[in-house]
């Protein structure tokens, strides 16, 4: 029986998060509250109380490294801790996810326990959303996203390429994200903000606008704009997609 539920709209998808293990909202990015919405969900995520996770959260969720593995019934969310441990599941239709967690409103023995639970919980939400996005002709993208005159512009680049620095030069009302955005094809390609900033204090936006262009920031090239060849552009986008 779910004791807590809330609905959001992320990347143009309706997301329902429910929990029978206490309120998970303090473990989500603070900006998530700006994405609250109503409507029938495209994706439902459930967190339930799990005795194995509660026995030793630090050992169960450390280190915060996760992968997805295909199963007959869908996908497994795996934590890598010397050996692979299944932490959650995602349906084959990628419209439902379930993960066991300790009691979320309980007392933590040390602060690190809460921190690792938070990283696993957010990692699972991102994995579920990425799976649903892929099923809906979309993907997350490590990029800064800007809205100008009703159009969206994404700026990808390797670490320290300048995505966050560039984002600081735009008013908050024009910013979709300084690190993680989403692209999805509906009637046309759309650029969406997500609740995850690049760092503490980073800025995000909950809107979505038509995608006009993607720029690859590269400090090794002379200043200016150069059109990329399709193969090179696809390679750069693949590098900047979550893995």
Model-inferred region functions:
Residues 161-163:
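Conserved glycine(s) of the Walker
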Residues 1-159, 169-176, 181-243:
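A noncatalytic interaction/capping subdomain that flanks phosphate/NTP-handling catalytic cores
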Residues 166:
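Hydrophobic positions on the alpha1 helix immediately C-terminal to the Walker A/P-loop
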